[in-house]
C-alpha cells in the first residue's frame, strides 16, 4: 500500500494562468484554442502569432452580407403591426373628421324651414340681384333703348341674361337657409361664391350692352 503524505502541493486555478505547454514550448490559450498554422516556407508549419490572411473577395462578400442585413432592419413596411399608435395618422383622421363635420353644417337643404317668411326670402334675393341689373337697365333707359332695335344676337344675349337672373334667384330662394347661415359664419367665402354665381349674368349684360350700343351708333 502507498502511504499518502500529509503535505499537498497548492493548485493554481486562476483564469489568467490557465495554460498548457505543448512540446514545442508554445503557450496555448485554453479559451481561444490552438493558434492557426503558418507556412514556414520549407515545408513545415508553425503556430502563427497573427491571424491568417483573408481573401479580399471573401471580405467583400462579408461586407455585402452585413449591408443587406443592415438595410433589412430599416426596410419600409406598410401598415406594420408594431402595437404603437401612429400619431400622424391619428391627427389626419381627426382633421378629416372635423372637416366633414364642418361641411355638414353647411350642407344644402332645398326649401328648408328656418322660420323666415317667403316674403323676406324674396326680398333678400332681389336685394342681391337688383344692383347688378339696375345698372344695366338704367343704361338702357338713359340711351332710350327700344326692343325694336334689338338684333338677333341682342335677343339671344337678352334671353341668356334673363335666364341667368332667374336661375340665380331660384337658387338663392330655394337654398335660403343654407346660404344665409354660410354668409353669417363665412362672409368672405360667401362673397366670392356670389360673384362667381352672378359672373355669367354680369358678363352677358356687358356684352349685350356693347352690341346694342354698336348697333345704334355703328
UniProtKB/Swiss-Prot annotation:
Membrane topology: Multi-pass membrane protein
Coiled-coil segments: none
UniProt-listed InterPro entries: WTF (IPR004982)
Transmembrane intervals: 122-142, 152-172, 191-211
Keywords: Membrane, Transmembrane, Transmembrane helix
Gene name for this UniProt entry: wtf7
Subcellular location: Spore membrane
Protein name in the entry: Wtf element wtf7
Major place of residence: membrane
GO terms of biological process kind: meiotic drive
Function per UniProt: May act in meiotic drive.
Family in the record: Belongs to the WTF family.
Region spans: Disordered: 1-23
GO CC field: cytoplasm; membrane
Domain of life from the UniProt record: Eukaryota
Amino acid at each position: 500500500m502507498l502511504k499518502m503524505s500529509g503535505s499537498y502541493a497548492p493548485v493554481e486555478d486562476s483564469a489568467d494562468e490557465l495554460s498548457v505547454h505543448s512540446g514545442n514550448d508554445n503557450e496555448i490559450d485554453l479559451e481561444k484554442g490552438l493558434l492557426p498554422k503558418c507556412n514556414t516556407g520549407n515545408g513545415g508549419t508553425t503556430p502563427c502569432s497573427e491571424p491568417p490572411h483573408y481573401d479580399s473577395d471573401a471580405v467583400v462578400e462579408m461586407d455585402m452580407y452585413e449591408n443587406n442585413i443592415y438595410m433589412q432592419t430599416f426596410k419600409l413596411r406598410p401598415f406594420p403591426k408594431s402595437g404603437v399608435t401612429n400619431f400622424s395618422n391619428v391627427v389626419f383622421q381627426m382633421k378629416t373628421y372635423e372637416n366633414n363635420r364642418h361641411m355638414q353644417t353647411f350642407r344644402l337643404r332645398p326649401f328648408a324651414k328656418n322660420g323666415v317668411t317667403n316674403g323676406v326670402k324674396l326680398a333678400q334675393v332681389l336685394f342681391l340681384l337688383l344692383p347688378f341689373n339696375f345698372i344695366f337697365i338704367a343704361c338702357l333707359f338713359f340711351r332710350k333703348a327700344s326692343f325694336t332695335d334689338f338684333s338677333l344676337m341682342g335677343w339671344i344675349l337678352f334671353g341668356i341674361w334673363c335666364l341667368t337672373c332667374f336661375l340665380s334667384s331660384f337658387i338663392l330662394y330655394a337654398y335660403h337657409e343654407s346660404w344665409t347661415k354660410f354668409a353669417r359664419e363665412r362672409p368672405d367665402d360667401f362673397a366670392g361664391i356670389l360673384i362667381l354665381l352672378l359672373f355669367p349674368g354680369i358678363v352677358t349684360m356687358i356684352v349685350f350692352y356693347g352690341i346694342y350700343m354698336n348697333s345704334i351708333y355703328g
